[in-house]
Regions:
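A generic, well-ordered mixed alpha/beta core segment in the N-terminal half of proteins
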Residues: 1-78
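Beta-strand segments within the central parallel beta-sheet cores of soluble alpha/beta enzyme folds
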Residues: 19-21, 141-145, 185
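Hydrophobic/aromatic-lined pockets within catalytic cores
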Residues: 47-52, 102, 133, 180-182
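Soluble metallo-hydrolase cores and metallopeptidase-like ectodomains found primarily
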Residues: 59-164
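Anion-binding catalytic surfaces of enzymes that hydrolyze or transfer phosphate/sulfate esters
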Residues: 163-166, 181
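A conserved active-site cap/scaffold subdomain adjacent to cofactor or substrate pockets
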Residues: 169-170
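Alpha-helical support elements that line or immediately flank enzyme active sites
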Residues: 173-181
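Conserved small/polar residues in nucleotide/adenosyl-binding loops
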Residues: 183-189
Length: 189
């Protein structure tokens, strides 16, 4: 079902200071400010250079880490708070923070750390290689998207509503599907 999301661009991984981010562009009608400081999950498919297809889901399992778009702390955001809702967060600021730990900084020193210039990015790439078997060049053939992490849940003390990512889009698809499924009950005219 087509729902708003953050699509990961090709060749997206970059390091800014010690922070590692994924470059994105938003898809669909979103209120950009609602996508900051919430847990996001990555979903998608990566086709490796050898042709192998890998399904990726990071952030939906309770044991998974989540990723997210950072935002300014309230006491540093005076200028930001003066902007109207459409401008509080610009689309180009919706890059996803995926890590900050430099290679070789953990308890066990990493022999691969060496003189690597972008050690945090190198560490993220090492983790992706270890868990999923893909390298930086495999991002070129990847279709990855970030969506709010977590399942849909009942809303309201009386459980009378449902709250979840894409619920407004999905409820329309459900009613359309139900309408089609009942068309066999109509008489030809």
């Amino acid at each position: 079902i087509d729902s708003p999301r953050l699509d990961v661009k090709q060749n997206p991984l970059y390091q800014d200071e010690e922070l590692v981010l994924l470059d994105t562009h938003y898809y669909g009608g979103i209120k950009k400010y609602q996508w900051t400081a919430i847990p996001l999950a990555l979903h998608g498919v990566v086709v490796l250079t050898d042709g192998k297809k890998i399904n990726v889901v990071i952030g939906e399992d309770m044991d998974d880490p989540v990723v997210g778009v950072s935002d300014l702390l309230i006491h540093l955001a005076a200028e930001q708070m003066e902007k109207n809702g459409a401008k509080v967060v610009e689309g180009e600021a919706l890059d996803i923070l995926v890590g900050s730990m430099p290679m070789g900084s953990g308890k066990k020193k990493d022999e691969d750390a060496g003189e690597e210039k972008e050690k945090s990015k190198a560490y993220i790439l090492k983790l992706l290689q270890k868990k999923y078997g893909f390298k930086e060049e495999d991002f070129m053939s990847a279709e990855l998207e970030a969506v709010p992490a977590g399942p849909a849940r009942n809303m309201g003390i009386d459980n009378s509503m449902i709250m979840g990512y894409g619920q407004d889009d999905r409820v329309c698809a459900y009613t359309s599907l139900m309408a089609v499924s009942y068309t066999h009950l109509t008489l030809p005219t």
